[in-house]
Amino acid sequence: MYRLPDGIQSVDVDTDRLRMHCLVAGPADGTPVVLVHGNLATSLFWDELMAAAPPQLHLVAPDMRGFGDTEPKPIDGTRGLRDWADDVHALLRALQISGAVHLVGWSTGGGAIMQYAIDRPDAVASLTLIDTVSPYGFGATSDVDGTPTTADYAGSGGGVANPEFVQRLRDRDDGSESDFSPRNVMRAFYWHPDYRMDAEREDALVAEVLKSNISDDGYPGDHVPSQHWPGVAPGERGILNALSGRWCNVSGIVDISPKPPVLWIRGDGDLVVGDQSSFDMGALGQLGAIPDWPGDEVYPPQPMVAQTRAVLERYAAGGGETREEVIAGSSHGPFIDHLDACAALLYDFLG
């Protein structure tokens, strides 16, 4: 049975929005750092990174709405990632943590902490974006400026999740018989395929993903038909709609004041968030995996990394401090498959 590393505690916190399960580590009077996980993940994914932290930091890693052991309240997709950002703020209030905090966000969590900074720039000491979702959300944008491919953002949202994968999540499939079993999806995309995780830890992380709220209010969310390729457009409920470019746009971070320093860490082999993402409809259409693709001029792959870089360049031009670090041989979770390198970058940045 998998055990948490020494010094990490599991706690439940009642906030004025929902009950949140968290992992916490470090002295209560230490420098506060909040770690926000990504889609189809939980706080447990952070445990080894938390265990590597210097002793002066107080780390809080919540299970976000829709995932883990946090109360499974609905996700309002029309708010983008603001539900998650507001939940973090409510958690900090409940923990009586005041003042500016360091925010670390992985994938979807990166978008959530950018939204947090837009809404509360004075409350952020720094932002660390780890393989972050693009500031223009996930799917259905065509260029570095986030221009939508169609007016209804077809090809993003709750309707683009693979149905076999969704069913296996719903069935709590912890095996490895199918490429779409959650375990195999994690092995292929969450960390580098060459990385071999301890079996007990892998079992624990699979079990965490299987706690996800699989529904229209959680993952994947609802959807509506579209006259545009590939025939579905985002709905208004659930996490994939919150991530759709229709509802998620945190490019306004370039205008915040004050501007906290930003560290962007990414794996060079990320297949989830990239300019040729394995989950992007444009990229899949280009490969012939989805029929009737209308071509690059109509529906190109979303340039996710280029979009993030362009926004951070504008942030820097406006007076902000930014830094991009690429970890070679890493995938979507560099703090998993390259723990030492990622921890060194993060904790050096946090000081």
Stretches found by the model and what they are:
Residues 1-33, 54-57, 97, 156-158, ...:
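Alpha/beta-hydrolase fold catalytic core
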Residues 15-16, 61-104, 108, 118-119, ...:
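Active-site loop/oxyanion-hole signature of alpha/beta-hydrolase fold enzymes
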Residues 21-77:
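Conserved HGGG/HGGXW glycine-rich cap/lid loop of the alpha/beta-hydrolase fold
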Residues 112-116:
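Hydrolases whose catalytic domains are alpha/beta-hydrolase-1, hotdog thioesterase
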Residues 122-141:
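A conserved short beta-strand
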Residues 147-307:
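Alpha/beta-hydrolase
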Residues 291-299, 330-339:
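Catalytic histidine-centered segment of alpha/beta-hydrolase-like enzymes
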Residues 324-330:
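Short glycine-rich catalytic loops that host catalytic nucleophiles or stabilize transition states
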